[in-house]
């Protein structure tokens, strides 16, 4: 039984170090050597639990996406329409990526690496029927998953492309919502209302509050403290 507890303790220590380093200095800049040194574990112990650094990221990814649409519901109301909940949630994600380069790196990797992408697509696809069934009543789980495959690709592209004077955040959100909501057969007048509502929000302040809550939740879940807080 001691061996099981020891393995659990090593896993927890690795996760604590990795999540902190990913958020403080970025995923790519966090080397396996640094992880081993700070977690005080051997290479064999690490790879016995996590076959690769990306496997650690899958645990972080699952935590980040397990409460999708919770923040959006708190902002626009739990009784808001499905398209508005979707619009607010995706706008928050896009804004988070724009405000924090470490989060952008994590999000883009999550939407790129096959195993991580599959995890996110399946989690998001499970939410889509309750959001868009009224617009696509004939669609089942397979069809909604197929739509998520496409819209997640759109999300990745907009996250990876940084805003500029020529392409400000408001324009990015508008373009993304037009393309994604049309995919779900939402009427144009309703799409326009969703975009107007999202753009009327102080989305940067909201994203900052969400980021602070996310970081606090990660600190509690993985037992670490971020530097420079």
Predicted regions mapped to residue ranges:
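The short coil/loop that forms the "turn" connecting the two helices of the helix-turn-helix
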Residues: 9-10, 41
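Generic hydrophobic, amphipathic alpha-helix propensity
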Residues: 10-18, 35, 60-64, 68, ...
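Short alpha-helical functional segments enriched in proximate histidine and acidic residues
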Residues: 21, 67, 71, 96, ...
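Helix-turn-helix
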Residues: 21-55, 59
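Hydrophobic alpha-helical connector segments
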Residues: 59, 70-103, 113, 121-125
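Secondary-structure edge/capping motif, primarily at the C-terminal ends of alpha-helices
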Residues: 72-76, 104-107, 158-166
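Amphipathic alpha-helical packing segments from all-alpha helical-bundle domains
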Residues: 111-160, 167, 171-178
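C-terminal peripheral helix-coil segments that are non-catalytic and often amphipathic
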Residues: 133, 164-229
């Amino acid at each position: 039984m001691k061996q099981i507890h020891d393995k659990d303790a090593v896993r927890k220590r690795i996760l604590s170090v990795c999540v902190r380093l990913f958020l403080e200095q970025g995923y790519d800049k966090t080397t396996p050597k640094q992880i081993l040194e700070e977690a005080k574990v051997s290479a064999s112990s690490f790879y016995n639990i996590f076959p690769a650094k990306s496997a650690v990221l899958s645990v972080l990814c699952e935590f980040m996406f397990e409460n999708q649409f919770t923040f959006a519901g708190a902002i626009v109301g739990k009784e808001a329409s499905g398209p508005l909940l979707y619009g607010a949630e995706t706008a928050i994600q896009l804004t988070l990526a724009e405000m924090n380069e470490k989060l952008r790196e994590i999000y883009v990797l999550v939407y790129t690496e096959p195993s991580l992408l599959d995890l996110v697509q399946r989690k998001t696809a499970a939410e889509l029927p309750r959001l868009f069934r009224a617009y696509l009543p004939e669609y089942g789980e397979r069809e909604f998953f197929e739509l998520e495959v496409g819209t997640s690709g759109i999300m990745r592209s907009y996250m990876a492309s940084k805003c500029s004077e020529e392409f400000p955040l408001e324009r990015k959100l508008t373009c993304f919502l037009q393309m994604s909501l049309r995919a779900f057969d939402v009427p144009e007048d309703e799409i326009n209302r969703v975009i107007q509502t999202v753009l009327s929000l102080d989305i940067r302040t909201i994203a900052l509050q969400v980021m602070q809550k996310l970081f606090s939740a990660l600190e509690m879940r993985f037992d670490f403290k971020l530097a420079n807080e």
